[in-house]
Amino acid sequence: MPPAILKGWVDRVIQPGLAYEFLEGDSGEGVPRGLLQARRAVVFNTSNTLPEREQSAFGDPLQTIWKSCIFGLFGDADFYRKTYCVVVTSTPEQRAAWLDDVRAIVNEKFPR
């Protein structure tokens, strides 16, 4: 589950009539049609759980939430997600390198 402040943002932005709509005659049981023009989504997560453990123990629920439940409403959006871990044992140098990596990925995915 994302932090509460992020969950609040998602609830405000990803809502019927703004981000998606149900087709006429569909009261919400069908597949919504995306309204947003975004065709690319990038998510960065931090974690104290190694990816291997996340996958084996939990099946990577954050991937499912972000890719399928949230950005899946955009249709065929190019989705990219990267997790940086383990935060609790990381060094300042390692965290600085993560930020450099984030900058490089953003520049690659959203060229100016």
Where in the sequence are the language-model features?
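Helix-loop-strand module that forms the ligand-binding subsite of alpha/beta enzymes
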Residues: M1-W66
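Glycine-rich phosphate/pyrophosphate-binding loop and the adjoining helix
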Residues: R53-R112
